[in-house]
């Protein structure tokens, strides 16, 4: 697979048209895409704490999970703590995102289920985030929507590692081009950009400057370590400070 490095950010391109599993990111977490067959029964059992998110399903498809009474719809999430997820698909294919860890949750066991409308929402000046697995102690899985013409902070993380996957739209990745300057002193003229299109991933390690600018409306799904408040905003169009901003929560 072709990997390009931009200021420490690793960019990969994927072709996700085939049935089966495609690994999107790995390290402290595992993150993969799974496309089912038209009619298939599949068991996910390799992770101890993980989310199964229904990214896309055709009209008329039926998705059921052993131990969950409700039929799944697009955008729904099943959370597993310490047990396999047995999924049955009829009239697919259905496209799933699965993320989690081999490390178990310290307290919880069993399956839980959430509809898309009930996922934890964080309002952003550039769009929104949905924290698909809530504020989990082992890993994070997010949906990120960024409106055309807006951009995130130019930021870095002290501890957080993340894999962002662009599924819809066109974006620019901003990165540090002037390696002779510290992250906290970077100005716009010290950065460069590269365009990314679907389906591309951006792997971001701690201390790596990055920013996404939406050329069109864009939709990403990010898996990361659970350091959700670990953000240092070097440049921000809305002058937001570092860290978690309570005004963005509870919406």
Which residues make up each language-model segment?
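Short, surface-exposed beta-edge/turn micro-motifs
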Residues: 48-52, 93-96, 141, 160-162, ...
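Short hydrophobic/aromatic-rich beta-strand segments that constitute the beta-sheet cores
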Residues: 63-65, 80, 98, 153-154, ...
């Amino acid at each position: 697979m072709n990997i390009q490095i931009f200021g420490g950010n690793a960019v990969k391109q994927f072709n996700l048209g085939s049935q089966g599993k495609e690994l999107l990111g790995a390290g402290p977490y595992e993150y993969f895409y799974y496309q089912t067959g038209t009619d298939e029964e599949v068991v996910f059992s390799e992770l101890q704490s993980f989310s199964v998110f229904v990214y896309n399903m055709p009209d008329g498809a039926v998705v059921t999970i052993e131990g969950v009474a409700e039929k799944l719809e697009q955008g729904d999430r099943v959370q597993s703590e310490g047990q396999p997820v047995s999924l049955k698909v009829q009239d697919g294919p259905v496209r799933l995102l699965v993320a989690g860890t081999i490390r178990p949750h310290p307290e919880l066991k069993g399956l839980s289920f959430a509809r898309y409308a009930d996922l934890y929402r964080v309002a952003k000046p550039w769009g929104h985030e949905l924290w698909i697995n809530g504020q989990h102690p082992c890993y994070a899985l997010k949906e990120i929507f960024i409106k055309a013409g807006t951009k995130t902070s130019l930021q870095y993380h002290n501890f957080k590692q993340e894999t962002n996957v662009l599924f819809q739209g066109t974006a620019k990745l901003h990165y540090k081009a002037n390696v002779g300057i510290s992250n906290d002193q970077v100005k716009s003229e010290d950065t460069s950009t590269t365009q990314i299109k679907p389906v591309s991933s951006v792997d971001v390690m701690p201390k790596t400057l990055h920013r996404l600018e939406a050329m069109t409306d864009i939709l990403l799904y990010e898996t990361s370590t659970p350091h959700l408040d670990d953000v240092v905003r070097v440049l921000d169009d809305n002058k937001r400070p570092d860290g978690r901003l309570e005004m963005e929560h509870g919406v």
